[in-house]
């Protein structure tokens, strides 16, 4: 059995099937390792409220949300890295200036999810906002575009060197967050809090913002469906998200307790 104290998994493209469900088999494996003293955690770009609704019976010990903007351990918030109200307004104004008034924006923080797209209104977790008078701090601002040059101009409205901006591989959006709001920074804060070496963590991921996490942790595992950049830094590659790759790799790592 590997010397692992914590399993961390991304959600979309990793723990989730493509339809955003988690199999009963995977839930049972997670419950088994938790009963045997192994911590299980989620590490996702989603806001906490937008992740919990899909877990259905899974109770993570660790919750890293907003791409690393916030960390919870046993439901206690232990790390927070967000844009101030003024910084959010500067970025939003720059987004409208660079892309025009019809650009689609989303923002999220500890308390909610906000979008100026009315397509989100069918989801009770989203709140419509035109962002013309938005007065809340946020961990993450997302812009519907893959134009890196324009996204860079938006980031430069603050200090581009202090902003992390990455595309999503599966949707035409960019995510902007503070430089320290990354999964690897969040894990470092968690390890400091728990007095735990990252070498005792196994992490699963599939997308750009999982790269730092997989490189930091003792065992970085890419999904078979991961982008090539993630596979290149991973220690191992497991089965795809559709094949319950996370759960099956946990069994291999933690036999006989999984």
Which residues does each predicted region cover?
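Short active-site oxyanion
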Residues: 37-41, 59-61, 139-141, 199-200, ...
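Conserved acidic, metal-coordinating active-site core of Asp-based
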Residues: 94, 98-216, 225
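Residue-level signal for inorganic ion chemistry
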Residues: 33, 67, 141, 214, ...
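Asp-based, Mg2+/Mn2+-dependent phosphohydrolase catalytic module
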Residues: 216, 221-258
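Asp-based phosphoryl-transfer active-site loop
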Residues: 3-19
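Active-site phosphate-binding/coordination module
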Residues: 18-120
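Short, structured coil segments at secondary-structure junctions
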Residues: 58-59, 67, 158-161, 216-217, ...
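Phosphate- and divalent-cation-binding pockets in alpha/beta enzyme and binding domains
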Residues: 25, 50-53, 153, 186, ...
